[in-house]
Amino acid sequence: MSGQADIALIGLAVMGQNLILNMDEKGFVVCAYNRTVAKVKEFLANEAKDTKVIGADSLEDMVSKLKSPRKVMLLVKAGSAVDDFIQQLVPLLSAGDVIIDGGNSEYQDTSRRCDELAKLGLLFVGSGVSGGEEGARHGPSLMPGGHEAAWPLIQPIFQAICAKADGEPCCEWVGDGGAGHFVKMVHNGIEYGDMQLICEAYHIMKSLGLSADQMADEFGKWNSAELDSFLIEITRDILKYKDGKGYLLERIRDTAGQKGTGKWTAIAALQYGVPVTLIGEAVFSRCLSALKDERVQASSVLKGPSTKAQVANLTKFLDDIKHALYCAKIVSYAQGFMLMREAARENKWRLNYGGIALMWRGGCIIRSVFLGNIKDAYTSQPELSNLLLDDFFKKAIERGQDSWREVVANAFRWGIPVPALSTALSFYDGYRTAKLPANLLQAQRDYFGAHTYELLGQEGQFHHTNWTGTGGNVSASTYQA
């Protein structure tokens, strides 16, 4: 029978299968396709048995089974695989049909695909999908962007299958071009930051001699207050987990992997000139963890401080760690939203920052109560330049900064690496400093490269000084540093 499916989904790895089952559960007829056709038959005979899901044995067969305008979602590996499928789909589709890329594609690729397909009359959507396998099955956070004309066509499906927070769907149109995938990239970068901050809190507690159960209890307490979040919750569960050999966490090799989206966020921050320092440190911390053999060798020859980790009042210091984690988390999100704001300005995206915070409230890895406070901040002040300037977050840091400073200072004294906690504190202090030592930096640049400088009160007028009396008076035009 032709024209019976509401949407087709290409790619039957776990995420693809679970999204199909989610759509089916919400009443949509889905056509499943995979490059390896045997996988389609296997899926229909097992996971999709007794559902309305139908299969296709070729792209032509798949397209013939779709209602018009046709909607095809790709959940395949980012990069050339997406372009290959698009190339094969183009001759089979008609003007007004929609192709959706639900993978972790680079936002520049999504922008390019939008431009290319617009010339052919096809609508393209690049959608971030967050929440992992469980989210895909029971309600992910969805961040669609691209050709806005596609939104009314996919909105009923996307808002039916997504997670809900306080009854509102964790899915809304993000913006043109690569906006959806850019927001998903920043989400993943913030996820890197959150995880690193939690790891540093764990490292400090472990150095103080807390047992796995004691640390789990502490994370459990934090999860019932302002740090209530998915990542804090699973950290508690991981710490408590035992198998036949005891606590599993202690036997896991301390080398962290990464798929690249955190790195993309750090690169984008450099490209847009936004100091997203915490996410950068989170990425570099994973790189450092990968140097396991070198670290083991260095640990036996490089000396640290003689001071051991100990405090007079453990209960109070554990509370200090909680406040430090919360304050640094505020900075991480402030930096992420700074990056989105600058990218939106340069790409002429109309991003709804409160809406983005709501999209992240449910279904995704960084879901937390905290995001509700961010939504409130941008709802009351849509043009807010930085979350740190919002009254709620300003007061939170005022309450917690003494604890934050105490934790970072002690970690330094004890030789415990806290790159994320400390870079967040440095950013906070830099952001609140009216006059930074960049005047000296600019003078140095002018000294060796004749790069000129502005004088206070004479902004826009550039001066060069012959610092040695032997150089010239001409400013530089090519040499940059």
UniProtKB/Swiss-Prot annotation:
Gene3D superfamilies: 6-Phosphogluconate Dehydrogenase, domain 3, N-(1-d-carboxylethyl)-l-norvaline Dehydrogenase, domain 2, NAD(P)-binding Rossmann-like Domain. One of its GO terms (cellular component) is cytosol. One of its GO terms (molecular function) is phosphogluconate dehydrogenase (decarboxylating) activity. Pfam families: 6PGD, NAD_binding_2. It comes from the Eukaryota. The lineage of its organism: Eukaryota, Metazoa, Ecdysozoa, Arthropoda, Hexapoda. Pathway: Carbohydrate degradation; pentose phosphate pathway; D-ribulose 5-phosphate from D-glucose 6-phosphate (oxidative stage): step 3/3. The active site is at K184 (proton acceptor), E191 (proton donor). It comes from Drosophila melanogaster. This is 6-phosphogluconate dehydrogenase, decarboxylating.
